[in-house]
């Protein structure tokens, strides 16, 4: 009889978590996200020496694209007071660390939610990308949008990023600023507004472009209603002659004796 090898829980625990396929996929996803965040950082940072966190990068990206300032929703006093304090016990330090991590995740979640709403509202990206908008997909769509639509960005954002967008030089940006804004042609500009008198007196046209029927002025007359009272029945009865046929009302003939009997009954 062959020997059956029974597996125990110790066999599964022998493999560390950082070597499992799930941890490898999470690590790969984290590295791609960090690369995209660094690319966003090169767009929104004011100088190369400026050191900003991922939350600040996302705040500036959201303000650059949508114009919404999410950073004002969070107060910076909470973290500064907690870092200045000296905690005696390890539990207090751990509590402050968890609170700081919650605030950091809340900031990132709000930024990604705002960018996701912007993508869905503008119908950006492909249909397959919009079905499952993960953080990597959101950052890829937003970076591509910034590079190809630098003219549509909000003017209140950082002006230093314009030379960095899509590899454009400062000369092209200056030439674009010197260009005159294109005016929108409307229908009313194609057809000038002319009055009827100007069209009639136009020397170039032999016949008027617009013709209107000449309606004479009818003077208002006052008439007495009572003087024409006799004509009113004839006015209303005349049309009825053509509509209703002439009807003869037939009444039964009564004899003189019956009439006398009726009068006697009334007298009695």
UniProtKB/Swiss-Prot annotation:
Comp. bias intervals (Polar residues): 1-23
SUPFAM superfamilies reported for this sequence: HLH, helix-loop-helix DNA-binding domain
Region (Basic motif): 92-105
The UniProt record lists the keyword Cytoplasm: no
The entry's keywords: DNA-binding, Nucleus, Transcription, Transcription regulation
The keyword Transferase is assigned to this record: no
Region spans: Disordered: 1-29
Outcome of gene disruption: Hermaphrodites produce fewer live progeny at 20 degrees Celsius than wild-type, and also laying more unfertilized oocytes throughout the egg-laying period. Abnormal gonad morphology. Delayed recovery from the developmentally arrested larval state known as dauer. Significantly longer lifespan. Decreased movement. RNAi-mediated knockdown causes an increase in daf-18 transcripts.
GO BP terms, alphabetized: dauer exit; determination of adult lifespan; female gonad development; negative regulation of transcription by RNA polymerase II; regulation of neurogenesis
GO cellular component, one term: nucleus
Locations listed in the record: Nucleus
Residue numbers spanned by region Helix-loop-helix motif: 106-149
Domain bHLH span(s) in chain numbering: 92-149
Molecular functions (GO terms): protein dimerization activity; RNA polymerase II cis-regulatory region sequence-specific DNA binding
Disulfide bond annotation, renumbered to this chain: none
General function of this protein: Probable transcription factor. Modulates lifespan and also recovery from the developmentally arrested larval state known as dauer, perhaps acting upstream of phosphatase PTEN/daf-18. Regulates expression of genes involved in cell division, cell-cycle regulation, and sexual reproduction, including daf-18.
Protein name: Helix-loop-helix protein 25
Native source species: Caenorhabditis elegans
Organism ancestry: Eukaryota, Metazoa, Ecdysozoa, Nematoda, Chromadorea
